[in-house]
Amino acid sequence: LWKLGVTAKTQHNEVAPAQHELAPVYETANIAMDHNQLVMETMKKVAERHNLRCLLHEKPFAGVNGSGKHDNWSITTDTGMNLLDPGETPNENIQFLLVLACVIKAVDTHADLLRRSASNVGNDLRLGASEAPPAIVSVFLGTQLEDVVRQLVETGEARSCLEGSTLHTGVSTVPDLPMDATDRNRTSPFALSLIHI
């Protein structure tokens, strides 16, 4: 893939038998989409050369996890500033809160378009009603941002910000781990997984 210009940095096993995930390096959205298509075409050709089949159908077998094909995105300025970066104290980051409000409003206003872009028979079968149903367009903020937004709605200002929690492993040889306050919600097709929280 690197020879084709696709800078894939990660690959790992997924839930279904012989299912793998590939994560390319972030790049401009339209190039990332083109690379996504190129990766899928390349995987099919390489599999064929080895007398295998690469199944890219969203739900090839009932009762077995399907294949997701998506691109994560962000909004950056021409100078590289990430407008979806909440910083260490999102309750004080006015620029971030403004952009966040605009994204939430856009999802609410254009839910029908988002639904049409994410929904097809294969995706409905893959996700069903118990994971991330494309029929329901929602925004998941995570506990920290949800609290900041709640404060803004109820009082007009956000004076505090919840701290991230810790996962206590209970194993003496494994350290406790910080938990991401915005980790994606599997029931939301529009989940904010933000950095620095």
Language-model regions, residue ranges each:
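Loop-rich catalytic cores of soluble enzymes, especially ATP-dependent carboxylate-amine ligases
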Residues: 15-16, 20-33, 37-41, 45-50, ...
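Conserved small/polar residues in nucleotide/adenosyl-binding loops
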Residues: 195-197
